[in-house]
Amino acid sequence: MAQPYPPAQYPPPPQNGIPAEYAPPPPHPTQDYSGQTPVPTEHGMTLYTPAQTHPEQPGSEASTQPIAGTQTVPQTDEAAQTDSQPLHPSDPTEKQQPKRLHVSNIPFRFRDPDLRQMFGQFGKILDVEIIFNERGSKGFGFVTFETSSDADRAREKLNGTIVEGRKIEVNNATARVMTNKKTGNPYTNGWKLNPVVGAVYGPEFYAVTGFPYPTTGTAVAYRGAHLRGRGRAVYNTFRAAPPPPPIPTYGAVVYQDGFYGAEIYGGYAAYRYAQPAAAAAAYSDSYGRVYAAADPYHHTIGPAATYSIGTM
């Protein structure tokens, strides 16, 4: 049992904040540890001296090493399988993605069921589309397979085959590159302020008195549409029409051009020299004002109330 130690003797607290001198503490009694202290046997503890060695049990290490070896080997295999598991499912996932094929040079009589029947033997098809315009089939289309592996097999088998005398081509469909188009339009209603373009694309917008613009029929059908070169029919329609008779106040003379002014719009020369009968009763100055010959003051006090100005 532990021996009780006497309490240490400390001096009384200092008076008036002046520390007092501490006396050295009494020495603690030392205990001799050279011998062994008897311990009650009911605790079941045994003390060993440093010179005594532990008895080695034969076969303890041999039995421990195989157990440790058998435990570490399965852990290594499981770790390797865990690392390799994310790599294997990635390949089937890529193969399961849909893939679209571009089929060109197909017969013009082919429709969607015909194209589906041709490619359906290689796998499940999600979508079939043949491109048409107003005249019919354009000779190409698209086939979308559920898996890319089926699409690759169909492309290898059908590319270059002859179908009704036409060699079809099957390739992987690629996304179309979209260019940035200018959306700003400085003109009203999308019409350009040009006489020829206006007559072709918007004849009713540039209509002038005395000019037979085709505002119905073919022109109305193409109004506001993307013509893509189809305006020749409209242009030829009003080009083939006979020129209108000249108007005395040259209302039809809008563009005094050497070509259009003489052929289409009547021209200023037709007004000046093709009216001998009208010139006898009335004459006009260079500004298009027509004065009556009976007015005695037409040349002194200005134009009379009977003059008219040509419509523009």
UniProtKB/Swiss-Prot annotation:
Q: Where in the cell is it found?
A: Nucleus; Cytoplasm
- Renumbered to this chain, the Pro residues biased-composition regions fall at 1-29
Chain ranges of the RRM domain:
100-175
**Which residues lie within the region annotated Disordered?**
1-104
Cellular component terms per the entry's GO annotation: cytoplasm; nucleus
Q: Which of UniProt's keywords are assigned here?
A: Cytoplasm, Methylation, mRNA processing, mRNA splicing, Nucleus, RNA-binding
Q: Which InterPro entries match?
A: Fox-1_C_dom, FOX1_RRM, Nucleotide-bd_a/b_plait_sf, RBD_domain_sf, RBFOX1-3, RBFOX1-like, RRM_dom
| Marked site (Interaction with RNA) residue numbers | R100, F108, R109, N133, K138, F142, R166, R176
| GO terms for biological process, alphabetical | mRNA processing; nervous system development; regulation of alternative mRNA splicing, via spliceosome; RNA splicing
- Purpose of the protein: Pre-mRNA alternative splicing regulator. Regulates alternative splicing of RBFOX2 to enhance the production of mRNA species that are targeted for nonsense-mediated decay (NMD).
User: What is the name of the protein in this document?
Assistant: RNA binding protein fox-1 homolog 3
Q: What organism is listed for this UniProt entry? A: Homo sapiens (Human)
Q: What high-level taxonomic lineage is stated for the organism?
A: Eukaryota, Metazoa, Chordata, Craniata, Vertebrata
